[in-house]
Amino acid sequence: MRYLHTMVRVTDLATSLRFYCEALGLREIRRIDNDKGRFTLVFLAAPGDERAQVELTYNWDAEDYGIGRAFGHLAYEVDDIYAACQRLRDHGVVINRPPRDGRMAFVRSPDNISVELLQKGGSREPREPWKSQPNVGEW
């Protein structure tokens, strides 16, 4: 057995792709447009690691997804937690849980999916502007 992917439903595919690809840094590795089923599947992966994938499911017709099915969060290891958070901020993403400890941060996708970022190799030295920033909203 091997892990394949985690599926998340999105309400605006273009906005979601800007978040996951441009801001977070994932890349699109496969896309399936199903005219009969009226949906699009987009598979994303971190550069250099296509084994762990996120599947964005976009239904062409409006649907109310309601509260998730006990879904927690997506998590990614990053080479530089501060650079990753700055990149997200530069794309207009709110850092809900700043990396005050130099190790962990949380943001939310356009569809309110919680995304955790963890510093590769353990904590970095805490530094400003991050170490004095409070949490913002839910994470």
Task: Spell out what each predicted region is.
Residues 1, 36, 51, 66-69, ...:
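A generic fold-level signal
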Residues 7-51:
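Core segments of cupin and vicinal oxygen chelate
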Residues 49-50, 62, 123:
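Active-site/binding-pocket entry motifs
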Residues 51-53, 114:
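Short, mixed charged/polar active-site loops
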